[in-house]
Amino acid sequence: MGKEKEHLNLVVIGHVDSGKSTTTGHLIYKLGGIDARTIEKFEKESAEMGKASFKYAWVLDKLKAERERGITIDIALWKFETENRHYTIIDAPGHRDFIKNMITGTSQADAAILIIASGTGEFEAGISKEGQTREHALLAYTMGVKQMVVAMNKMDSTEPPYSEDRYEEIKKEVSTFLAKVGYKPAKMNFVPISGFQGDNIQENSTNMPWYKGPTLCAALDSFKIPKRPIAKPLRLPLQDVYKIGGIGTVPVGRVETGVLKAGMVITFAPKGCSAECKSVEMHHEEVPEAAPGNNVGFNVKGLSVKDIKRGFVASDSKNDPATDTESFVSHTIVMNHPGEIKAGYTPVIDCHTAHIACKFEELLTKADKRSGKMTEENPKFLKAGDAGLIRLSPSKPLCVETFATYAPLGRFAVRDMRQTVAVGVIQEIKKKATEDKKGKKK
């Protein structure tokens, strides 16, 4: 047994037809946890449907369908490994809810693969003002995904095929817009690939002798492994709460920061009720403790299913326990709201697992969305493309944190008209004054 491989969570972004599914499917197909039998089955099914060319994308479509049907999808199917690393693809944006998922994320992405279609006309469509490519890159950057590799896909369909001139042209343009978003393109790898043919995915392509850089896999392996927030106090947003016969109340969720241990007295915010954690379970096995990234169920004594619910946050009562939030100030980027956002606007906010209406109490500043520099104080409104500092107050009890202290609880999506209209990063919080047992305000 050698040293255990390091693990990275990847998010795959890019325009809708850039070939994300094919490229991602190819990685999983070549390096993943899918056995040959399953792949043969997929190939046969896609051939029967007359979609033989989609065999890699088909891998992903099948996984998506299963993922949408139930939560018990075998997560191995979304994993692949290289010689040095394990990777999990935490989201591939085929979903309408991709933006929401990326923010409230089932998991924080450590790095991104930005897939660009290099075919004639395709690149221009993806990068145009309305293109999703820009939005996704800005989103990834705002949400703290600072490492990225650019995969220039469909090099087999440039004119002429595998054109170095086309590669250079696109690289220049993508670099310009990534630099505006905040990335440092000079430090990034731009890998020319064909997700379908397999050029430069694992092995250097003989079709592009002019390219001297790393393959896609080698570029992924050059990402730095982030430090997991294990030393921070515990924060565990609840996804569900179950009542299990003979055991009792079992909250379920993912440890975002710190460590959950049996025997710990847990405080649930925003309500403020506490109970002892009797046992911790992962994958149906009891474990002494759970670390960041672990999905767990834990048994609490003395609380009923009525006391706690999805969106509550579990924390250690003795180490910076989580509390109810009176109001918070956030750096907010308005993405695709059709009108003007003014003070008084009350959309639903998705922050970690909480889903609560919050009122935009005050528009404090308007800022340049890329540099964050203030351009106006107390603006009358913000519209799509604007950014600014906004003070919000929740309509019901809510527990959030600042992005700087507990990142996963400090970023949110603003949902309205069945879409994500804005995203925010929380900069400061005003906590509700709590009363202690004797009724005195703390």
Swiss-Prot record:
GO terms for cellular component: cytoplasm. This protein promotes the GTP-dependent binding of aminoacyl-tRNA to the A-site of ribosomes during protein biosynthesis. Disulfide bonds: none annotated. Residues 194-196 are annotated as: G5. The keyword Coiled coil does not apply. This is Elongation factor 1-alpha 1. Keywords: Cytoplasm, Elongation factor, GTP-binding, Nucleotide-binding, Protein biosynthesis. Its main location: cytoplasm. It holds the Pfam family GTP-eEF1A_C. Residues 70-74 are annotated as: G2. The keyword Cell division does not apply. Belongs to the TRAFAC class translation factor GTPase superfamily. Classic translation factor GTPase family. EF-Tu/EF-1A subfamily. Residues 91-94 are annotated as: G3. Residues 14-21 are annotated as: G1. Residues 5-227 form the tr-type G domain. Residues 153-156 are annotated as: G4. It is found in: Cytoplasm. GO terms for molecular function: GTP binding; GTPase activity; translation elongation factor activity. GTP binds at residues 14-21, 91-95, 153-156.
